[in-house]
Amino acid sequence: MLPMITLFGCSESAKHSVREYPETRKDLTVVDNYFGTEVADPYRWLENDTTAETAQWVEAQRAVTEDYLSQIPFREDIKKRMTELVNYERYSLPSKRFNRYLYSKNDGLQNQNVIYIQNSLDEEPSVLLDPNTLSDDGTVALSGTSQSNDGKYLAYTIQRSGSDWVEIYVMDIATRQLLPDHIEWAKFTGASWYKDGFFYG
C-alpha cells in the first residue's frame, strides 16, 4: 500500500512543475571491437567513481531526486509511520558454545544489530561487539560472525562503504581484544572454523 501512495504522491507533484534534469556527457570516442562488431560505450566514464566529473554528476542526480521527493506532501507522515513500525526490540536465536550464549539484539532504531554474550542464562548480558561503533559515519557494516569450536574466539567480517570485498577480524572473547590475524580482500565469504583455524574464500 505504501509504495502505491508514494508513487501517487510523486505523480501529483510532478504535474505542477517541469523538472530540468542534469545533462550526462556522451563520450563517442569509446568504442570496443568484439570480433569485428563495434560496440559504443559512451557512458563508460561514469565507471570511474573517483573523478571530479563523476562526483559532480552524482551530486546533480542527488539534488534533482531530493527536490522531487521533497514535494511529496505527506512524506514526513510516511517517515513517521515507518519509524513507528520498525521501532521495537528484535532478537536473534542464541547460539551456545561451552556454556556461553551469543545472540544479537536491536533496540529498535539502531542501524545494526549488537552482538551480546552471556556466560549463563541467569547472567546479565554484556556487549561483545557493537558494529555501530566501527565507524563514525556508519559506512562499516558487520556482515557475519562465527564462533570458534572451543568458544574462545569470534571471527567476524566487515564491509566498507557497501563493497563486496570483506575483511575478517578475530577477537578473543574473554578479553575482547583483536588478534593480529586480519584478512583483507576476501569476497562473498564468512569464516568456517575447523579445529584451531578457519576456512574462507
Q: Would you name each region that the model predicts?
A:
Residues M4-G201:
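Beta-propeller folds
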